[in-house]
């Protein structure tokens, strides 16, 4: 590669890094415009603003306004029909200034080459993911999150691939790659293989989930480390969060990765020149694309960078769990049929042709109240926390974000009283047939939801199935009711989220105390609601409108009178 082999370019990069060595407390829009124009790019800006549904205490923001800066390098050998993106996110507390310097150095180097067959967009976004979302919505002429932004004055071709860069230091020990995107989407596996190839060619250490590749697969340590990496990916994908700017590109069918420079205590370190060479190699390969990346897998799990688990291997695991629900529903259907027939007829013995008493119906009207009240509780869980935050903050000494979380927990806990409310309007005819019919409906409802989730986000579907299916199959009003109730509570969606947080930190080798875990759980609830309204993450509405009402049906079955 010819990147920065010239000493002049090395000194230019050193000056940029020195200029940007302090954090960018505010994006230097005018300076970025001048610098990009000086290297020969078409430079444009985009202003945007967004009012969050409630204050984001993690990033300390509520009314957000910022400016994105991007420069376009026109491909001299193309007609601006396709493009590539190199993006660097910045925020008020960002330490990503070294990545901005490397982006500008790459822009200056790419400008002097004549082999580009695609436009290259160099994008610096303000307020990290909010700026990225504003730019993507304006570029594709859509508005899915309600963000207000100015129209883009300059455009390139259809975006084929994107790379997001985050560097916290001008020297690194490894590059960590992040693939998990919004709602569990993943980039094409070929893009990840391309990154690994150029890291190996340049001698760069590349990591996945912050962990190096296992070197010894013959001993037990290698498979255990791979299992740990695999579980970390499953938990990150199941969260549905965009774990980097690349996660928002995937929504628009743009294959993207986020690369993070890690500066640890390892002895061997690499400067920005080595990172720039790897990026140049990736962009030169992507420049030769004749069509979008599609030959490799879009559904996979990664125990290591050099190994993957394809959809054909892991999907049967979810299928067998859903089969349990199907078999249990079939059993209940047969029991309902036998309960409606006479004892001889149930055994297949013909009886005398006497006038039989009227067969007792299933009592479908008795199911209307539990179904409606369960869905109403789910709708309240989705709507009321954000709508009632100001009222709660006025009457209680809490902030808006705390009011949202406390309202969520209050409505969630109020659902435990559901059986005592619904039994007042439920018909007392055929109580056994009533709970069996309700459980049959709940099993089919749960199986359909988990099946659809597993098709789009396997990690989330599998985690929910592994926790909810056993309790759902066992729940009935006969038997050890306290044991079944404890099992249902421990496998509820909220308990699954809490347990996943503890498992996540344990796999990261940063264990939590109970108090720290509870605080992290409350912060995760607030972030889940914010990400739904800010980026369109579907985990919160899925749990509130789908799985929580379904779980309440099983809770109702357990306490059926």
Give the label of every model feature segment.
Residues 2-4, 14-27, 54-60, 87-96, ...:
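Second-shell loop/turn segments in exported
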Residues 4-76:
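A non-catalytic alpha/beta surface segment that caps or lines the substrate-entry region
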Residues 46-58, 120-133, 211-221:
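Acidic helix-start/capping segments at beta-turn-to-alpha-helix junctions
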Residues 83-133, 414-418, 438-448, 465-477, ...:
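Alpha-helical metal-binding/catalytic segments enriched in His/Glu/Asp
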Residues 92-192:
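Acidic/histidine-rich catalytic neighborhood of metal-dependent amide-processing enzymes
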Residues 159-161, 167-291, 295:
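Active-site-adjacent substrate-binding region
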Residues 201, 236, 251, 260-351, ...:
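His/Asp/Glu-rich mid-to-C-terminal helical/loop segments that flank catalytic regions of hydrolases
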Residues 311-561:
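Alpha-helical transmembrane segments of integral membrane proteins
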């Amino acid at each position: 590669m010819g990147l920065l082999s010239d000493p002049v370019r090395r000194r230019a990069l050193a000056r940029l890094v020195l200029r940007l060595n302090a954090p960018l407390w505010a994006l230097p829009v005018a300076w970025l415009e001048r610098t990009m124009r000086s290297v020969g790019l078409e430079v444009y800006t985009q202003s945007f603003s967004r009012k969050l549904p409630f204050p984001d205490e993690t990033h300390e923001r509520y009314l957000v306004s910022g400016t994105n800066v991007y420069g376009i390098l026109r491909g001299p050998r193309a007609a601006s029909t396709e493009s590539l993106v190199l993006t660097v996110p910045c925020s008020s507390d960002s330490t990503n200034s070294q990545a901005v310097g490397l982006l500008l150095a790459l822009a200056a180097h790419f400008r002097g080459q004549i082999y580009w067959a695609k436009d290259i967009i160099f994008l610096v976004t303000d307020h990290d993911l909010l700026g990225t979302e504003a730019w993507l919505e304006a570029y594709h002429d859509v508005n899915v999150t309600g963000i207000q932004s100015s129209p883009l004055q300059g455009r390139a071709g259809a975006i084929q691939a994107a790379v997001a860069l985050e560097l916290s230091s001008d020297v690194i020990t490894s590059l960590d790659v992040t693939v998990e995107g919004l709602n569990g989407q993943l980039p094409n596996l070929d893009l990840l293989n391309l990154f690994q190839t150029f890291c190996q060619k340049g001698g760069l250490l590349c990591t996945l989930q912050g962990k190096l590749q296992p070197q010894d697969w013959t001993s037990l340590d290698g498979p255990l480390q791979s299992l740990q990496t695999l579980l970390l990916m499953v938990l990150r994908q199941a969260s549905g969060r965009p774990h980097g700017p690349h996660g928002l590109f995937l929504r628009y069918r743009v294959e993207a990765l986020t690369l993070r420079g890690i500066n640890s205590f390892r002895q061997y370190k690499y400067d920005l020149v080595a990172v720039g060479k790897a990026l140049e190699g990736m962009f030169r390969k992507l420049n030769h694309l004749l069509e979008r990346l599609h030959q490799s897998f879009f559904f996979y799990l990664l125990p290591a960078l050099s190994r993957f688990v394809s959809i054909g291997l892991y999907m049967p695991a979810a299928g067998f769990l859903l089969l349990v629900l199907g078999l249990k529903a079939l059993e209940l259907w047969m029991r309902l049929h036998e309960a409606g027939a006479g004892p001889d007829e149930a055994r297949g013995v013909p009886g005398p042709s006497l006038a039989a008493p009227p067969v007792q119906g299933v009592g479908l009207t008795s199911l209307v109240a539990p179904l409606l009240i369960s869905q109403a509780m789910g709708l309240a869980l989705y709507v009321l926390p954000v709508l009632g935050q100001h009222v709660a903050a006025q009457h209680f000494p809490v902030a808006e974000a705390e009011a949202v979380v406390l309202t969520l927990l209050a409505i969630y806990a109020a659902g435990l009283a559901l059986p005592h409310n619904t039994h007042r309007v439920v018909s007392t005819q055929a109580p056994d047939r009533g709970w069996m019919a309700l459980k049959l409906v709940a099993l089919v409802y749960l199986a359909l939801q988990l099946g659809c989730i597993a098709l789009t986000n396997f990690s989330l579907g599998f985690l929910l199935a592994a926790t909810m299916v056993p309790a759902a199959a066992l729940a009935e009003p006969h038997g050890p009711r306290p044991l079944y109730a404890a099992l249902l509570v421990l496998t509820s969606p909220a308990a699954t989220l809490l347990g996943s947080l503890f498992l996540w930190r344990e796999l990261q080798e940063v264990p939590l105390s109970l108090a720290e875990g509870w605080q992290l759980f409350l912060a995760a609830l607030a972030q889940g609601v914010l990400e739904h309204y800010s980026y369109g993450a579907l985990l919160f509405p899925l749990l509130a409108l789908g799985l929580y009402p379904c779980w309440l049906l099983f809770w109702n079955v357990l306490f059926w009178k």
